[in-house]
UniProtKB/Swiss-Prot annotation:
Stated family: Belongs to the long (4 C-C) scorpion toxin superfamily. Sodium channel inhibitor family. Alpha subfamily.
Residues annotated as domain LCN-type CS-alpha/beta: 2-19
UniProt key word Secreted: yes
Domain of life: Eukaryota
Domain description: Has the structural arrangement of an alpha-helix connected to antiparallel beta-sheets by disulfide bonds (CS-alpha/beta).
PROSITE patterns reported in the protein's UniProt record: LCN_CSAB (PS51863)
Disulfide bond positions: none
Protein name: Toxin Tb4
Compartments in which it is found: Secreted
GO cellular component, one term: extracellular region
Function: Not toxic to mice.
Tissues in which the UniProt entry reports expression: Expressed by the venom gland.
Length: 19
């Protein structure tokens, strides 16, 4: 997946991964 950001669709706080 890709790195997520505080404003991504997943609502990640710091860094998360999603596909």
């Amino acid at each position: 997946g890709k790195e997520g950001y505080p404003t991504d669709k997943r609502g990640c706080k710091l860094t998360c991964f999603f596909t």
